[in-house]
């Protein structure tokens, strides 16, 4: 048996999307070896769920945030001759290690995403992480933090870049005006996508708003479109009003996948000048649509964005540098197209779901056969 442990799988979000990718590949791998597969989610509602990633279906059971129920189900599953457990977040590492009491020969993988391991974990979580056979990370930057902050031997850390979602990839090219959300602005558009939470201001949405007055002097039809919601939206809207650019900042929430794809297609530049991205799946989505991307010169973003070739990297909070990067692109449409084309080529070469699935299956095979 192979067991997968997940924080949650149904909601939107980068960690959730990676979880779905993992679940789909784990299921496919188990089926190919005629092994039983059990996928458990801590936060999702307590019934059997069915989801898919592209044409790969998987089922999982939720626990409605009941940690006791989740842990008990995991322990019972481990007793059924489990060979491998994959914990899709470091916070679930203690559950995975507890399962090894019931199945001492079972191997374990823990997935680290980024900012959650940039500081030392609690003693319990760090000890469980150290006892794992393999720690998967999406970038070398995250791998370095796992090694230094959590004191994990480097030979147990494997870098596995995340992938473009095949459902996004398979969408029909959504460029028609009718596919855009209602009241989408006319003009040249900078797009940003994220969660606008007060505890996640590292995303850099505020610096985009601060840069707008300078940019509007040269391009008065410029618009900033922000897809996502959060408790910081009121603060950001007030910032736009105080800066006199409220008519150029537009928030959209609850978009369909087709509407989101249309937003990527309709924008001229994608920007998320964050200092806390462990990877940045939204960069892949923009690159797949042939758009130049601007990200923070921090975390895992420099491993996704080729500075000066597929976009630009800027220091978090450096508004003049951010504005200059945007100006360079807006003033040179040929450069925009060139960078966008390079980004699309890189996604097609390195970040397709098939590449991710093949690499993950190789790791699963090694552990199952060792």
What residue ranges belong to the model's regions?
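A short, well-ordered alpha-helix in the C-terminal region of glycosyltransferases
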Residues: 321, 328, 335-349, 356-359
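Nucleotide-activated donor-binding/catalytic signature segment of Leloir-type glycosyltransferases, i.e.
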Residues: 234-255
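Carbohydrate-associated surface elements
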Residues: 141, 163
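Short hydrophobic beta-strand element within catalytic cores of glycosyltransferases
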Residues: 292-295, 305
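Short alpha-helical donor nucleotide-sugar binding micro-motif in glycosyltransferases
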Residues: 129, 254-255, 262-267
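Aromatic "clamp/platform" in nucleotide-sugar-dependent glycosyltransferases that forms part
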Residues: 275
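Conserved donor-binding/catalytic core segment of Leloir-type glycosyltransferases
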Residues: 183-203, 209-212
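Conserved acidic donor-binding segment of nucleotide-sugar-dependent glycosyltransferases
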Residues: 307-308, 312-319, 328-333
């Amino acid at each position: 048996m192979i067991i997968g442990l997940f924080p949650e799988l149904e909601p939107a979000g980068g960690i959730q999307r990676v979880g779905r990718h993992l679940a789909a590949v784990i299921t496919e791998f188990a089926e190919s070896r005629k092994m039983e597969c059990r996928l458990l989610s801590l936060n999702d509602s307590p019934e059997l769920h069915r989801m898919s990633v592209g044409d790969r279906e998987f089922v999982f059971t939720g626990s409605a945030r009941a940690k006791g129920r989740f842990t008990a189900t995991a322990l019972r599953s481990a007793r059924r001759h489990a060979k491998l457990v994959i914990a899709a977040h470091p916070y679930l590492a203690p559950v995975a290690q507890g399962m090894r009491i019931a199945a001492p020969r079972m191997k374990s993988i823990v997935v680290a995403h980024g900012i959650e391991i940039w500081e030392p974990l609690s003693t319990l979580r760090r000890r469980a992480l150290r006892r794992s056979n393999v720690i998967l990370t999406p970038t070398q930057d995250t791998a370095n933090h796992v090694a230094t902050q959590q004191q994990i031997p480097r030979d147990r850390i494997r870098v596995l870049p995340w992938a473009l979602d095949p459902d996004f990839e398979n969408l029909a090219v959504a460029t028609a005006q009718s596919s855009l959300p209602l009241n989408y602005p006319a003009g040249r558009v900078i797009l940003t996508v994220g969660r606008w939470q007060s505890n996640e201001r590292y995303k850099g949405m505020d610096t985009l708003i601060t840069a707008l007055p300078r940019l509007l002097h040269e391009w008065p039809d410029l618009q900033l479109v922000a897809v996502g919601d959060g408790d910081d939206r009121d603060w950001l809207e007030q910032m736009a009003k105080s800066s006199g650019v409220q008519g150029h900042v537009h928030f959209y929430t609850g978009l369909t996948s087709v509407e989101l794809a249309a937003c990527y297609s309709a924008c001229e530049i994608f920007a998320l000048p964050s200092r806390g991205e462990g990877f940045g799946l939204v960069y892949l989505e923009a690159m797949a649509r042939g758009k130049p991307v601007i990200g923070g010169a921090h975390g895992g973003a420099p491993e996704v964005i080729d500075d000066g070739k597929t976009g630009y990297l800027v220091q978090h909070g450096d508004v003049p540098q951010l504005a200059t990067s945007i100006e360079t692109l807006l003033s040179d449409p040929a450069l925009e197209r060139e960078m966008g084309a390079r980004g699309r080529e890189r996604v097609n070469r390195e970040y397709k779901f098939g590449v991710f699935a093949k690499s993950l299956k190789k790791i699963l095979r090694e552990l199952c056969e060792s």
